[in-house]
Regions:
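Basic, amphipathic N-terminal segments that precede the first structured/catalytic domain
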Residues: 11, 65, 70-71, 77-120
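Aromatic-lined carbohydrate-recognition surfaces of secreted/lumenal glycan-active proteins
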Residues: 217-228
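Surface-exposed, active-site-proximal loop segments in enzymatic domains
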Residues: 68-69, 137-158, 183-196
């Protein structure tokens, strides 16, 4: 492991949180008592919130940026060990960030056993592994400029296949159970490629990756409408992803990134149908105004986030699925003007709020209203849940998990970013950015 100095402030002690929670206890209890009297089954909702965990991607811990520039916040994690420590801090604060998702080759560990131990010390598990064939690496023999798994050159496809299999191997070493494949493969101009052959090449390549999966693993095929290719993307929408996963087999699932749709797509309907087909694998949560903006979850379209969770809760309950374990939950955001850790705390909070609101929907009343096509009543039932302030339930879940009633306030009170800059430097850049 690297010899970078430890930052004690990152390892907030229980007494720090206890002092903070004590100061807020009376006000919190008043709010909790009120909302508990308003929402039937609030105790069961809190129990589900305590169990719910959202993975943090390693690449979200540093400042993101755009093609026009990047403005570092300083103190960014310089290696996988520091990334684990940062996510451990988030989990200590909110009790709901108990998993880390690695991106290879950025996060290749020199000592996988030591990494597993470090993660366990912070109460973290390893979520999906992410491969990278959308950019060329320094030691790479062949280029992905014109695609990877779709490439017209079989040698390039073979290189990309071998990379994905290597990512699986690394994941096995640290205890991950899934692989996410996002491809930038596509074209920028009409006539650049044959759509059918590109699909067939990609499917053939994915089949070789699929064959390397351990029996208890899943592969998630992530789709995106456009960018970096702007005329066509070879896994461009949920229908194409569903085609791939259906042809691959029962261990293959579609992954939904909220920002990977065309504007105003009905994501909640997509979610419902993928659940119906037993092909929904997981989520990358973020928010957007125009494209794949990767903004803080719930910052632009909180009602849409609630509607998505409404379909998730209904669909998962209809199939007897575990909310905690049967889908992959992850944030995928880029932070250009915010402190990345503060942004992640906000995103987790927004996701938990939307989940709690969906759990509070009067399902029996909604089904009854739907059965007689009472459109007004259906809308009222959903908006009653959405407009109810469930933040005391989310805060109580944190309290029961041993975390902070107000994570962001604790983060700022102990000046965590200032301490990170002091120990890591003002000009550090997180790997992968």
């Amino acid at each position: 492991m690297h010899s970078y100095a430890k930052i004690e402030i990152m390892k907030l002690e229980n007494y720090h949180l206890e002092s903070h929670n004590s100061d807020l206890a009376a006000a919190h209890q008043r709010k909790l008592d009120f909302i508990s009297s308003e929402i039937p089954g609030s105790s069961a909702i809190i129990d589900k919130l305590v169990d719910f965990q959202i993975a943090i991607p390693s690449w979200a811990l540093g400042t993101g940026g755009t093609r026009f520039g990047r403005f570092s916040s300083g103190g960014e994690p310089r290696n996988i060990e520091e990334k684990i420590e940062d996510i451990g801090l988030l989990h200590k604060l909110n009790g709901a960030s108990g998993a880390i998702s690695l991106h290879i080759p950025w996060d290749t560990a020199d000592n996988p056993s030591a990494i597993k131990v470090l993660a366990a010390q912070h109460g973290l598990r390893f979520d999906a592994m992410n491969s990278n064939t959308f950019q060329d690496q320094a030691d790479q023999e062949l280029s992905y400029k014109f695609g990877s798994l779709q490439h017209v050159d079989k040698a390039v496809r073979k290189q990309a296949i071998e990379h994905n299999i290597e990512v699986i191997r690394q994941g096995i070493e640290i205890g991950s159970k899934s692989l996410t494949v996002w491809l930038s493969d596509g074209s920028c101009f009409p006539g650049q490629l044959n759509f059918r052959k590109a699909f067939q090449n990609t499917l053939e390549s994915l089949r070789e990756v699929y064959a390397a999966l351990p029996a208890d693993w899943k592969v998630f095929v992530e789709y995106k409408a456009f960018e970096p290719n702007f005329y066509s993307t070879t896994v461009g929408d949920w229908g194409q992803s569903l085609l791939y996963t259906s042809k691959l087999g029962p261990q293959a699932y579609t992954l939904v990134d909220l920002g990977h749709h065309l504007p105003n797509a009905n994501i909640e309907q997509i979610v419902s149908l993928l659940l119906m087909e037993e092909k929904l694998g997981g989520f990358h949560f973020n928010d957007s105004k125009y494209g794949d903006d990767d903004l803080t979850a719930g910052s632009m379209k909180p009602y849409q986030l609630f509607l998505i969770f409404n379909e998730l809760v209904e669909g998962m309950d209809a199939r007897g699925m575990s909310h905690k374990d049967d889908l992959g939950w992850m944030i995928d955001a880029s932070h250009n003007v915010k402190d990345p850790l503060e942004d992640l705390l906000q995103s987790v909070e927004a996701i938990m709020i939307a989940y709690a609101q969906a759990l509070s929907v009067d399902r029996e009343a909604l089904v009854a209203a739907q059965s007689i096509s009472d459109v007004v009543r259906c809308q009222e039932i959903l908006q009653q849940a959405f407009r109810t302030d469930v933040r005391p339930l989310v805060a109580e879940a944190r309290l029961r998990a041993g975390a902070a009633l107000d994570p962001l306030a604790v983060y700022r009170q102990y000046k965590v970013r200032e301490e990170l800059i002091k120990n890591r430097g003002a000009k550090t850049v997180a790997t992968g950015l």
